[in-house]
Amino acid sequence: MNKILRRGIYEEDINFVGMLLFVTCTAQAAVPEDSAAFHDKYQLQKMLVLSRHNIRSPLGETINKLTPHKWVKWTSAPGELSQKGGELETIMGQYFRERLVHDGLIAENEQPAAGKVRFYANSMQRTIATARYFSSGMLPVANVSIEHQFAPSQMDPVFTAAFTFMNDAYQAKVMQQIAAKGGKNGLRGIGSGLADSYRLLEHTLDISQSEVVGSKGFKGFCTDDIAIVLENHKMPYVLNSLKTAISASDALVLQYYEEEDPVKAAFGHDLTIEDWKEISKPKDNG
């Protein structure tokens, strides 16, 4: 069995790359639902899994100025995998171990020979750590090495969504496609679509009492100031209200997963699941 696990990729038998994706020797699309009859008829031979890192701490310190409240005490440095993220990723690995043992792709407590299993991760602390926790759950008695191209923390080009080509015509085409997401109003339409999220973010953060309002003159998230920058050899990035809202949205959602009490996670506000979905929109669409 020649396996390459690449938090990354398992080529030949199993692949682990980013969001969960299963590939069998047949087309699952032909089967409307997961059924016992299907499993009796087909044998899993290969699997490809694409996965991002698990829960991390927020990326920057801007969030401290957006609310008068204290954020949770993060268990890791900014942008690094949190303790909760490690726990959850171990559980994820255990789930895959049970599934793969059940389907006969690996043995219980398998110890693959050297070189038969490879874990390849992006060279960020959060991704290397995610791969390590996942491997401990999936292969708990195996001495697995985690491969990465650079010393932490540097982005591996394999995983970087940076432009490798740019000219005026291409830039205009990309901007046109982005603006189309806002309908006939273009970028303003994107901003308008986030209006409810912006207001809920302001309310949850109690942003009117924050440092950014008191010292910076910030008056709230605007729906009409979206700016997008496209440059060669860089990832696309946004400016102004959406940039700040993405940071706030990201931090609140991470706090929701890190803090067991959802009311505490929302700084004393009793939010519904639908509210949390609304809060997550800026980071999901940004």
Q: Could you tell me what each predicted segment is?
A:
Residues 4-16:
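Bacterial N-terminal signal peptides that target proteins for export
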Residues 15-24:
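Bacterial N-terminal signal peptides
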Residues 29-116, 122-286:
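Signature for phosphate-centric chemistry
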